[in-house]
From Swiss-Prot:
GO terms for cellular component: cytosol. It comes from Escherichia coli (strain SMS-3-5 / SECEC). This is Glycine--tRNA ligase beta subunit. GO terms for molecular function: arginine-tRNA ligase activity; ATP binding; glycine-tRNA ligase activity. The gene is glyS. It comes from the Bacteria. Keywords: Aminoacyl-tRNA synthetase, ATP-binding, Cytoplasm, Ligase, Nucleotide-binding, Protein biosynthesis.
Length: 689
């Protein structure tokens, strides 16, 4: 069977840049699934994406499905015919579904009986006939949150469609996709090359588009070119470009023919905090800032034009004129804000609502101030500095700079606090209070910042859970999952002596009578332990290891982490599997017993050597391990407990627990309970698989 290259290109108006990659990747994944479901043999499915097009190129696509043999078993002969030999309704319905009459059916005889059988040779459908529906289905499944309609058509897509190219080899596949009749016409760059041309063969793509249309259709190629050219441009002026991945992706999605250029701005603007300048360049203008080797911002930026100009200086000057007013605004806001102290913004926080049932930002500030001081006391941080940081924590939200450039919240608080002469750890805390903002983000760097960051997040968790608005499904408007994981990361990775129970209780107490959920403390702790589960799964821990620790519900995050590491290490020991099984057996025995057990094992009642030996070792280990448990040395404790494997195995081999003698039975059950209690001081290892 011969093979050909298939090309589909959907020519559109400008597609959403932040969604371009996901649209193209989904298009490729959907179409690959369609090919596989149809049984069409194919080679590589390559996707292309540019601002005004999505395309797929499939190598070595078979021209038809393979022929296949099908068999459909019908009713058993006993049910297929009545006593007179006439076909039953069931048989006739089955035959009708197969497109035959009952007398045309074959018979299948097996050891279990005889059935009607339809057997047919089905010729594979041509690829040409299948492709239009496969393309339409793949496009319909794209992750488009908001569709649009254009003109008088009822067709909906992410953006208006102007061309549809469907080529199998050199042949146009006739179809109407998204309201457009397929053709071999492709549109080029808006301002360079040929605005429209025809493509003779699918194999010519994407080279013909580059040569005639001045469009680099390969997304990764455009991105790599921008990165390389920007790095070279920065090197020429003695700096390093800030090529953040997200901005690089967005810029690659905005241009069809990237041309990297370098521009500059007045050095006087460098007196403004670099974060505000960078926010303006990256967020508003999609420029790449340039830093000197010492990390200081240079008065230059790199941008990407979508055209090759005969006079690039004109484009450079135009971009410099565009960015200057924005930088001047930042300079003005910075100078204006510094005319008063950060603390002077406190009264204005009373005018901004945090949440209707939970009060204003000033109310939140008061709670954070108190909670940050309480946390500081628990972890040995400077209480006065922590409460001061809490008081100032939201003041920068009322400044002109943050109002205009919202992403500078926190960092501008730090700059204004330094200007006001606040303590350095207070200023840094204002910047780091929102950390970690995302997975893998840096944690607060000093104890005061840790106290403030935890206080801010715990106040939100307690408040939102306290009014019953916990996250549901994928909806999490207050980012509670991120807040919970942030608190856990700070406590664990900074090894802070904090207990979620008392921490949550204190956060809830500070709300007074505002909260309506009577179970708020337990709800918050359960939610945070659930985030622990997700975190440790991401870290590669097995589900049963996590469940074994969660079963003990340890509420000290650092303690939880120590238990996780201990159980993970325990699983590597030779005795682990046997002791996990033994614990499961003990757990089942105790669960089935309704006896009232003793407080201690009665040594005089013990009879068998195996139970005497086990009882003695349990007593010895109980005393030996007490300081281990007190110090959180769970790994050492489990290593010691692993020594119980032989006496435990011997006990179950030689000793009957559920004997008729009640006193002896209760004594043996008590010993097993004491044995299990030792392991439960760390985790429920009976849950290990």
């Amino acid at each position: 069977m011969s093979e050909k290259t298939f090309l589909v290109e959907i020519g559109t108006e400008e597609l959403p840049p932040k969604a371009l990659r996901s649209l193209a990747e989904s298009f490729a994944a959907n179409f690959t699934a369609e090919l596989d479901n149809a049984g069409l043999a194919h080679g590589t499915v390559q996707w292309f994406a540019a601002p005004r097009r999505l395309a797929l190129k499939v190598a070595n696509l078979a021209e038809a499905q393979p022929d296949r043999e099908i068999e459909k078993r019908g009713p058993a002969i006993a049910q297929a015919f009545d006593a007179e030999g006439k076909p039953s309704k069931a048989a006739e319905g089955w035959a009708r579904g197969c497109g035959i009459t009952v007398d045309q059916a074959e018979r299948l005889t097996t050891d279990k009986g005889e059935w009607l059988l339809y057997r047919a040779h089905v010729k594979g459908e041509s690829t040409e006939a299948l492709l239009p529906n496969m393309v339409a289905t793949s496009l319909a499944k794209l992750p488009i949150p908001k569709l649009m309609r254009w003109g008088a058509s009822d067709v909906h897509f992410v953006r208006p469609v102007h061309t549809v190219t469907l080529l199998l080899g050199d042949k146009v596949i006739p179809a109407t996709i998204l309201g457009i009749q397929s053709d071999r016409v492709i549109r080029g760059h808006r301002f360079m090359g040929e605005s429209e041309f025809t493509i003779d063969n699918a194999d010519q793509y994407p080279e013909i588009l580059r040569e005639r249309g001045k469009v680099i259709a390969d997304y990764e190629e455009r991105k790599a070119k921008i990165k390389a050219d920007a790095e070279e441009a920065a090197r020429k002026i003695g700096g390093n470009a800030d090529l953040s991945e997200s901005l690089l992706e967005e810029v690659a999605s905005l241009v069809e023919w990237p041309v990297v250029l370098t521009a500059k701005f007045e050095e006087k603007f460098l007196a403004v905090p670099s974060e505000a300048l960078v926010y303006t360049m990256k967020g508003d203008q999609k420029y790449f800032p340039v830093y000197a080797n010492d990390g200081k911002l240079l008065p230059n930026f790199i941008f990407v034009a979508n055209i090759e100009s005969k006079d690039p200086q004109q484009i450079i000057s135009g971009n410099e004129k565009v960015v200057r007013p924005r930088l001047a605004d930042a300079e003005f806001f910075f100078n204006t804000d510094r005319k008063k102290r950060l603390e002077d913004n406190l009264p204005r926080l009373q005018t901004v609502l945090f949440q209707q049932q939970l009060g204003t930002l000033r109310d939140k500030t008061d709670r954070i101030q108190a909670l940050a001081g309480w946390i500081a006391e628990q972890i040995g941080a400077d209480v006065n500095h922590a409460t001061r940081a809490g008081l100032l924590s939201k003041c920068d939200l009322m400044t002109n700079m943050v109002f205009e450039f919202t992403d500078t919240q926190g960092v501008m608080g730090m700059h204004y606090a330094r200007h006001d002469g606040e303590a350095e750890d207070v200023a840094v805390a204002l910047n780091e209070q929102y950390q970690p903002r995302f997975a893998g983000d840096d944690l607060p760097s000093n104890p005061v910042a840790c106290a403030l960051a935890i206080a801010d997040k715990m106040d939100t968790l307690a408040g939102i859970f306290g009014i019953g608005q916990h996250p549901k499904g994928d909806k999490d408007p207050f980012a509670l999952r991120r807040a919970a994981l942030g608190v856990l990361r700070i406590i664990v990775e900074k090894n802070l002596n904090l207990d979620l129970q008392t921490l949550t209780e204190e956060a809830v107490r500070l709300y007074g009578d505002k909260l309506t959920n009577a179970n708020v403390v337990d709800d918050v702790i359960d939610f945070m332990l659930g985030r622990f589960r997700a975190w440790y799964q991401d870290e590669g821990y097995t589900v049963d290891t996590i469940q074994a620790v969660l079963a003990r519900r340890p509420t000290r995050p650092a303690d939880f982490d120590a238990r996780m590491k201990a159980v993970s290490h325990f699983r590597t020991l030779d005795a682990a599997a046997a002791l996990a099984a033994a614990n499961k057996r003990v757990s089942n025995i105790l669960a089935k017993s309704d006896e009232v057990l003793s407080d201690r094992v009665n040594a005089s009642t013990l009879k068998e050597p195996e139970e005497i030996k086990l009882a003695m070792q349990v007593v010895v280990l109980r005393d030996k391990l007490e300081p281990y448990f007190a110090e959180g040395r769970y790994q050492d404790a489990l290593v010691e407990l692993a020594e119980l494997r032989e006496p435990v195995d011997a006990f179950f081999d030689k000793v009957m627990v559920m004997v008729d003698d009640k006193e002896l039975r209760i004594n043996r059950l008590t010993m097993l309970e004491k044995l299990r209690e030792l392991f439960l001081r760390v985790a429920d290892i009976s849950l290990l698989q």
